[in-house]
């Protein structure tokens, strides 16, 4: 799968990781779109066992971006991250009365693409959005009070 990005990027892959793809995806969804530092911090405290290999791949992608592409590590964002299923190793578990159950040891391929994005001024935009909302609610409140005064007269 080739992914074209609008920002400078770097890729890292971990193949044949001994964790199922569904369990890896559970952890991956926590960090998609976050900055690399924030993603590694989230994974450091995540209780899931899959967080360790995912964190290693993100750290490797960040190192690739810094060493191979010459990108600033403070501007890196986890742009694309996904886990595909790898081959499944099959084992036999002996059970009672001569039966045998199959154990599936699932593997996955984890891919991470980090991009160097310019920092956003989210503090100013969030404050302006709050002020717009507050102005709208104030206008609605004054309009409602004016209507109730007209109705009582």
From Swiss-Prot:
Residues 110-153 are annotated as: Disordered. It comes from the Bacteria. Keywords: Ribonucleoprotein, Ribosomal protein, RNA-binding, rRNA-binding. Pfam families: Ribosomal_L22 (PF00237). One of its GO terms (cellular component) is cytosolic large ribosomal subunit. InterPro entries: Ribosomal_uL22, Ribosomal_uL22_bac/chlpt-type, Ribosomal_uL22_bac/org-type, Ribosomal_uL22_CS, Ribosomal_uL22_sf. GO terms for biological process: translation. Part of the 50S ribosomal subunit. PANTHER family: CHLOROPLAST 50S RIBOSOMAL PROTEIN L22-RELATED (PTHR13501), LARGE RIBOSOMAL SUBUNIT PROTEIN UL22M (PTHR13501:SF8). This protein binds specifically to 23S rRNA; its binding is stimulated by other ribosomal proteins, e.g. L4, L17, and L20. It is important during the early stages of 50S assembly. It makes multiple contacts with different domains of the 23S rRNA in the assembled 50S subunit and ribosome. The globular domain of the protein is located near the polypeptide exit tunnel on the outside of the subunit, while an extended beta-hairpin is found that lines the wall of the exit tunnel in the center of the 70S ribosome. This is Large ribosomal subunit protein uL22. The lineage of its organism: Bacteria, Bacillati, Actinomycetota, Actinomycetes, Mycobacteriales. The gene is rplV.
């Amino acid at each position: 799968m080739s992914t074209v990005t609008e920002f400078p990027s770097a890729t890292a892959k971990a193949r044949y990781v001994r964790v199922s793809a569904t369990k890896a995806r559970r952890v991956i969804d926590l960090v998609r779109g976050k900055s690399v530092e924030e993603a590694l911090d989230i994974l450091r405290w995540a209780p899931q066992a899959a967080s360790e290999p995912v964190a290693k791949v993100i750290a490797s992608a960040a190192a690739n971006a810094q060493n191979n592409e010459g990108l600033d590590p403070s501007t890196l964002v986890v742009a694309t991250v996904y886990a595909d299923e790898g081959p499944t190793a099959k084992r036999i578990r002996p059970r009672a009365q001569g039966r045998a159950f199959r154990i599936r040891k699932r593997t996955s391929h984890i891919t991470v693409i980090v991009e160097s994005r310019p920092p956003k001024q989210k503090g100013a935009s969030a404050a302006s959005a709050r002020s717009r909302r507050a102005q709208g609610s104030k206008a609605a409140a004054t309009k409602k009070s004016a209507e109730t005064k007209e109705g009582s007269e």
